[in-house]
């Protein structure tokens, strides 16, 4: 193990983030670039960086912003995107991903960030961190750009498990509402259950049971249940938290990302078609840049694993430095708000409304009561 400095996971204004530097498609260079950007933006953040010391050492040494802020944990092996979760569970020790999660389990870091294989990361997280008491299926929650004043909605599950029964969906509502309180600064989030229609008679039988459970838990969970919602409500104003199973959520997420890219490509083609359209593009440059920023997937990079004894943020495997920095910023925000402890308290006893609300809201958003 090589380190520039040693530091504690706790302290006034200090947070320690464990980062898997080797699992992404772009390699450690993108992760180190994201670390450097994060170090400038988050003065109180320190990083335990896991991966091949031979590669990481020179990269980190070149970044002045990382001086005294990083400790390298040598991990010679890498979990690839093709590795099966079952294989990683049996033989993953010694990989950068395993080492990254182990730092959270040991209490050296508050939160973990990885760009690696999603299935393997969930498997390693479950066997090393274990599930919170009472949790049947952990979920992955993501931020979805929306028309709400805060700019985002929360959706879960987006791929942790393709199955979810009525009780799982009810638990997702509790976890999603807690995430919205701490990640979006919403005092009383509105929760919607994704269905093929908003009418009471539509949908599978388990969705109707889930609807009753989520509604019954609303007061204890300190959220407002708006009932069934449709796909068109995902980026809309009707709710703040979208609850669904992992299969449906993952398909919706990938469809949304693909649609955003398609729109971006169409705009680029349209404004480059001829001299007049190019002139129009110049005149509309400011507006186009603002639109590009709003639909840029890198800006909302980072899915959060909910329901574990520790916080894990999953970055896109293809994330560049900007995307990695966004995932680290999310991890830092959740660590600063004490999100994990508040979520555990909510799941352990949902009887006291507001017990998982942060003392100071950590991100801009709405805080008015509904």
From Swiss-Prot:
Involved pathway(s): Lipid metabolism; phospholipid metabolism
UniProt-listed Enzyme Commission number(s): 2.3.1.274
Assigned keywords, A-Z: Cytoplasm, Lipid biosynthesis, Lipid metabolism, Phospholipid biosynthesis, Phospholipid metabolism, Transferase
Disulphide bonds in the chain: none
GO cellular component terms attached to this protein's record: cytoplasm
Region (Disordered): 349-370
Metal-binding listed as a keyword: no
Subcellular location: Cytoplasm
GO molecular function: phosphate:acyl-[acyl carrier protein] acyltransferase activity
Reactions this protein catalyses: a fatty acyl-[ACP] + phosphate = an acyl phosphate + holo-[ACP]
Entry's Gene Ontology BP terms: fatty acid biosynthetic process; phospholipid biosynthetic process
Chief subcellular location: cytoplasm
UniProt cross-references to InterPro entries, sorted A to Z: FA_synthesis (IPR003664), Phospholipid_synth_PlsX-like (IPR012281)
Family matches, as Pfam families: FA_synthesis
Task performed by this protein: Catalyzes the reversible formation of acyl-phosphate (acyl-PO(4)) from acyl-[acyl-carrier-protein] (acyl-ACP). This enzyme utilizes acyl-ACP as fatty acyl donor, but not acyl-CoA.
HAMAP family: PlsX (MF_00019)
Similarity-based family: Belongs to the PlsX family.
PANTHER family: FATTY ACID/PHOSPHOLIPID SYNTHESIS PROTEIN PLSX, PHOSPHATE ACYLTRANSFERASE
Binding partners and assembly: Homodimer. Probably interacts with PlsY.
Protein's name according to its UniProt entry: Phosphate acyltransferase
């Amino acid at each position: 193990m090589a380190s520039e400095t040693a530091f504690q996971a706790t302290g006034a204004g200090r947070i320690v983030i464990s980062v898997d530097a080797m699992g992404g498609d772009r390699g450690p260079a993108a992760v180190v670039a994201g670390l450097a950007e994060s170090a400038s933006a988050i003065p109180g953040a320190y990083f335990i960086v896991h991966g091949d010391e031979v590669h990481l050492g020179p990269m980190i040494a070149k970044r002045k912003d990382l001086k005294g802020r990083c400790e390298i944990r040598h991990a010679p092996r890498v979990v690839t995107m093709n590795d099966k979760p079952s294989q990683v569970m049996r033989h993953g020790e010694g990989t950068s991903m395993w080492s990254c999660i182990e730092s959270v389990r040991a209490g050296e870091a508050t939160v973990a960030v990885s760009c690696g294989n999603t299935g393997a990361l969930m498997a390693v997280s479950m066997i090393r961190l274990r599930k919170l008491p009472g949790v049947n299926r952990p979920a992955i929650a993501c931020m979805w750009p929306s028309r709400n004043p805060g700019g985002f909605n929360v959706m879960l599950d987006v791929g942790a498990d393709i199955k979810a029964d009525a009780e799982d969906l009810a638990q997702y509502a509790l976890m999603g509402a807690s995430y919205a309180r701490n990640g979006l600064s919403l005092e009383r989030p509105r929760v919607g259950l994704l269905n093929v229609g908003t009418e009471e008679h539509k949908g599978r039988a388990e969705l109707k049971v889930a609807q009753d459970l989520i509604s019954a838990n609303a007061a204890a969970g300190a959220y407002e249940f708006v009932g069934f919602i449709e796909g068109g409500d995902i980026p809309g104003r009707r709710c703040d938290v979208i609850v669904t199973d992992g299969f449906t959520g993952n398909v919706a997420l990938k469809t949304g990302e693909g649609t955003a890219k398609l729109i971006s490509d169409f705009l680029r083609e349209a404004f480059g078609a001829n001299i007049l359209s190019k002139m129009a593009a110049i005149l509309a440059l400011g507006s186009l840049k603002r639109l590009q920023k709003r639909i840029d997937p890198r800006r909302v990079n980072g899915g959060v694993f909910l329901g574990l004894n520790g916080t894990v943020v999953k970055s896109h495997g293809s994330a560049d430095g900007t995307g990695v920095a966004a995932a680290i910023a999310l991890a830092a925000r959740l660590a600063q708000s004490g999100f994990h402890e508040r979520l555990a308290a909510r799941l352990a006893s949902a009887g006291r409304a507001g017990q998982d609300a942060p003392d100071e809201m950590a991100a801009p958003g709405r805080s008015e009561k509904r």
